[in-house]
Amino acid sequence: MVMTDPIADMLTRIRNANIARHETVEIPASNMKRAIAMIMLKEGFIKSVEEIDDGKGGILKLTLKYGPNKERVISGLKRISKPGLRVYARHDELPRVLGGLGIAIISTSKGIMTDKEARKAGVGGEVICYIW
């Protein structure tokens, strides 16, 4: 079956595993999903990213992060730019998620980066999702 929005599927898998307090979640791999996972790792939302070769496109195995009493580190994930309605923002219009407590992931001409990095680089782009 062809997936119409693989990024939304990735975010939904992470959200569901997080709510169920699973240790890991497996996601079909792609370059964009890999870049999003690496940003989540760098920003401290997940513990680790592992690539598994399944003979097809590969699988990303994300280890989710929880606090000392099993409280969730990821409070929420929201897809912003969808296949039916793309959302773009200039560098001076990039959104701040929860006043800077969360991150927006932006697809720019210089690659996929957080809203803070895009503001610093002075580039705008497609607002992929919010994570807080």
Curated annotation (Swiss-Prot):
| Pfam families for the chain | Ribosomal_S8
What GO molecular function terms would the record report?
Answer: rRNA binding; structural constituent of ribosome
Database matches in InterPro entries: Ribosomal_uS8 (IPR000630), Ribosomal_uS8_CS (IPR047863), Ribosomal_uS8_sf (IPR035987)
PROSITE patterns in the record: RIBOSOMAL_S8
Keywords linked to the UniProt accession: Ribonucleoprotein, Ribosomal protein, RNA-binding, rRNA-binding
Q: Which GO terms describe its cellular component?
A: ribonucleoprotein complex; ribosome
SUPFAM superfamilies (UniProt xref)? Ribosomal protein S8
Task: List GO BP terms, alphabetically.
Answer: translation
Recorded family membership: Belongs to the universal ribosomal protein uS8 family.
Purpose of the protein: One of the primary rRNA binding proteins, it binds directly to 16S rRNA central domain where it helps coordinate assembly of the platform of the 30S subunit.
Cite the NCBIfam families for this sequence.
PRK00136.1
Q: What is the official name of this protein in its record? A: Small ribosomal subunit protein uS8
Q: Which organism is it from?
A: Thermoanaerobacter pseudethanolicus (strain ATCC 33223 / 39E) (Clostridium thermohydrosulfuricum)
